[in-house]
């Protein structure tokens, strides 16, 4: 089998395609969370702290500038993304459990046999 054909089979498997879609969606979701943190959450936190720009907070030690405000902003980004993924996984697990607990749908054959059984039972009780 040629290398190109093997790669095509690998790339077209369901898991690889699902992973690719998940990565693209994750990147897009990260941009949304970053915009939320940078544009809404951190300015509100800054207002609560007296109008401070959190991202710009830093201190200097010698020649090194420690930008702890930017670090704090990225930690908040991470917490929001991690919490959203946690909630999503909980929701998926809940839906999978519900689906597993659903009874198998009755096939037309089984339904017909059940009706015949019920009719026979009613007729035998009349005799």
Swiss-Prot record:
Report membrane topology.
Multi-pass membrane protein
SUPFAM superfamilies under this entry? Gated mechanosensitive channel
Q: Which PROSITE patterns match?
A: MSCL
Record flagged with keyword Cell inner membrane: yes
Q: Which domain of life is it from?
A: Bacteria
**InterPro entries hit by this protein:** Mechanosensitive_channel_CS, MS_channel, MSC/AndL, MscL_channel
Keyword annotations for this protein, in alphabetical order, are: Cell inner membrane, Cell membrane, Ion channel, Ion transport, Membrane, Transmembrane, Transmembrane helix, Transport
Q: Name one GO molecular function term.
A: mechanosensitive monoatomic ion channel activity
Transmembrane regions listed in the UniProt entry? 9-29, 32-52, 75-95
Question: Where found?
Answer: Cell inner membrane
Q: Which GO terms describe its cellular component?
A: plasma membrane
Q: Which Pfam families match?
A: MscL
Q: Give me the disulphide-bonded residues.
A: none
Subunit details for this protein? Homopentamer.
What family is this? Belongs to the MscL family.
Function of this protein? Channel that opens in response to stretch forces in the membrane lipid bilayer. May participate in the regulation of osmotic pressure changes within the cell.
Return the protein name.
Large-conductance mechanosensitive channel
The record lists the organism as Legionella pneumophila (strain Lens)
């Amino acid at each position: 089998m040629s290398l190109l054909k093997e790669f095509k089979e690998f790339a077209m498997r369901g898991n690889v395609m699902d992973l690719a879609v998940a990565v693209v969606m994750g990147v897009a979701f990260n941009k949304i969370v970053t915009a939320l943190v940078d544009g809404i959450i951190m300015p509100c936190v800054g207002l609560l702290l007296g109008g401070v720009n959190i991202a710009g907070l830093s201190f200097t030690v010698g020649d090194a500038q420690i930008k702890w405000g930017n670090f704090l902003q990225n930690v908040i980004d991470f917490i929001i993304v991690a919490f959203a993924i946690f909630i999503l996984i909980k929701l998926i697990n809940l839906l999978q459990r519900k689906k597993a607990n659903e009874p198998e749908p009755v096939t037309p054959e089984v339904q017909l046999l059940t009706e015949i059984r019920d009719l026979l039972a009613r007729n035998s009780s009349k005799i």
